[in-house]
């Protein structure tokens, strides 16, 4: 039976903003034994030891992730997917749906059981539909506890939904006007772009929660009826549902994903519900709707405001350094090798790396 995780004990809810410090020594998933363990950089979102990103060290925990998603969804129409933390001063936590499958194994007289726990499953679905959905996801990406799929999900939560894209307290050095700009930025995307995909059988998107409401189409998107074996509007022929991305058929007995901001005439195969920019599956079905397509949080934010290539945070100042399609806070226009400020000095940008001439030459040799 599917279960919902509700770790709401206030005694374990207190998170430290110095999480990086407490995560010292965590092994790097990319470097394996070559990295001595996570050593936080003072302002870059990387390990000083191996130069890999924070997400390669999987610094977050289930509780960290649930609080982050809870904060993201609060004050939006998806707040029903969150729960208030008792004594938490208005803090909300994600009601993450976990699915536990227990299968008996016939081995002699005493029965044993094989238990599989999915660390996340689509919300609001039956166990049967949830399992059908999981079977359509590549095995290496299924979020089963203790597997590469579970690690993949956690890394994607960090990459696609950075905490510093929604929480000003996780950003470094925002001045008053930048803080106000960020608050308006977050408020706007929660109201106009943020969404959570819904898993249902073709033709059943929006039901029963929306069955008594008129489905509204977001401005700028088109609503088209499902194709009917090549002939629109013929009631004598069976309805054929088509995936919005690959244009392949969606069998009526196989789950698809709906995005309410797209309208319920559109559906995606589970593996096709991905960011239009990076083509990565949208983690936990969380999307941002823009220009008629779903985006991950990271790339949606970057499409609206520039992101600093140094600290990885969104830039809310109008005074920043830009080189081609890359941007930096003025104070972060710094060589990635020797850490000297490069404003007004010679520099070289190679494969996204900002280097002074000396470090660039050393790197090539």
UniProtKB/Swiss-Prot annotation:
Residues 99-206 form the PET domain. Residues 221-231 have a biased composition (Polar residues). One of its GO terms (cellular component) is cytoplasm. Residues 208-220 have a biased composition (Basic and acidic residues). The keyword Nucleus applies. GO terms for biological process: negative regulation of transcription by RNA polymerase II; positive regulation of calcineurin-NFAT signaling cascade; regulation of cardiac muscle hypertrophy. Keywords: Cytoplasm, LIM domain, Metal-binding, Nucleus, Phosphoprotein, Repeat, Repressor, Transcription, Transcription regulation, Zinc. It is found in: Cytoplasm; Nucleus. One of its GO terms (molecular function) is transcription corepressor activity. The keyword Cell division does not apply. Expressed in distal airway epithelium of the lung, vascular smooth muscle, and myocardium. PROSITE patterns: LIM_DOMAIN_1, LIM_DOMAIN_2, PET. SMART domains: LIM. Residues 200-231 are annotated as: Disordered. Coiled coil: none annotated. Residues 241-306, 307-365 form the LIM zinc-binding domain. Disruption phenotype: Mice display a marked increase in cardiac hypertrophy. The modification Phosphoserine is found at residue 16. The LIM zinc-binding domains and the Cys-rich region mediate interaction with GATA6. Transcriptional cofactor that restricts GATA6 function by inhibiting DNA-binding, resulting in repression of GATA6 transcriptional activation of downstream target genes. Represses GATA6-mediated trans activation of lung- and cardiac tissue-specific promoters. Inhibits DNA-binding by GATA4 and GATA1 to the cTNC promoter. Plays a critical role in the development of cardiac hypertrophy via activation of calcineurin/nuclear factor of activated T-cells signaling pathway. Interacts with beta-dystroglycan. Interacts with GATA1, GATA4 and GATA6. PANTHER family: LIM AND CYSTEINE-RICH DOMAINS PROTEIN 1, LIM DOMAIN-CONTAINING PROTEIN. This is LIM and cysteine-rich domains protein 1.
């Amino acid at each position: 039976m599917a279960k919902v995780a509700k770790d709401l004990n206030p005694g374990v809810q207190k998170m430290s903003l110095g999480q990086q410090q407490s995560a010292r020594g965590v092994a790097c998933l990319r470097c394996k034994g070559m990295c001595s363990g996570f050593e936080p950089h003072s302002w870059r979102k990387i390990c000083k030891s191996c130069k890999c990103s924070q997400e390669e060290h999987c610094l977050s925990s289930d509780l960290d992730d649930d609080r982050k998603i809870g904060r993201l969804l609060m004050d939006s129409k998806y707040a029903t997917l969150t729960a208030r933390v008792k004594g938490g001063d208005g803090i909300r936590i994600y009601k993450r749906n976990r699915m536990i499958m227990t299968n008996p194994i016939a081995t002699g007289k005493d029965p044993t059981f094989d238990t599989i726990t999915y660390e996340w499953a689509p919300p609001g679905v039956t166990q049967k539909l949830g399992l059908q959905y999981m079977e359509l996801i590549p095995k290496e990406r299924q979020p089963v506890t203790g597997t590469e799929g579970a690690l993949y999900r956690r890394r994607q939560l960090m990459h696609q939904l950075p905490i510093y894209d929604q929480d000003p307290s996780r950003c470094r050095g925002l001045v008053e006007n930048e803080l106000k700009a960020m608050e308006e930025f977050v408020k706007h995307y929660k109201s106009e772009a943020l969404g959570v995909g819904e898993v249902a059988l073709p033709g059943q998107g929006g039901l029963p929660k929306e069955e008594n409401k008129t489905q509204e189409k977001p401005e700028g998107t088109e609503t088209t009826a499902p194709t009917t074996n090549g002939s629109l509007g013929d009631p004598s022929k069976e309805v054929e549902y088509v995936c919005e991305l690959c244009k392949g058929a969606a069998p009526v007995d196989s789950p698809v994903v709906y995005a309410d901001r797209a309208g319920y005439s559109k559906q995606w195969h589970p593996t096709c519900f991905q960011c239009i920019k990076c083509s990565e599956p949208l983690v936990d079905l969380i999307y941002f709707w823009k220009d008629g397509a779903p985006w991950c949080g990271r790339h949606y934010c970057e499409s609206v405001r520039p992101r600093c290539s140094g600290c990885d945070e969104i830039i809310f100042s109008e005074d920043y350094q830009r080189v081609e399609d890359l941007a930096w806070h003025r104070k972060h226009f710094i060589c990635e090798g020797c850490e000297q400020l490069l404003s007004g000095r010679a520099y070289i940008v190679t494969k996204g790396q900002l280097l002074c001439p000396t470090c660039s030459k050393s790197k090539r040799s």
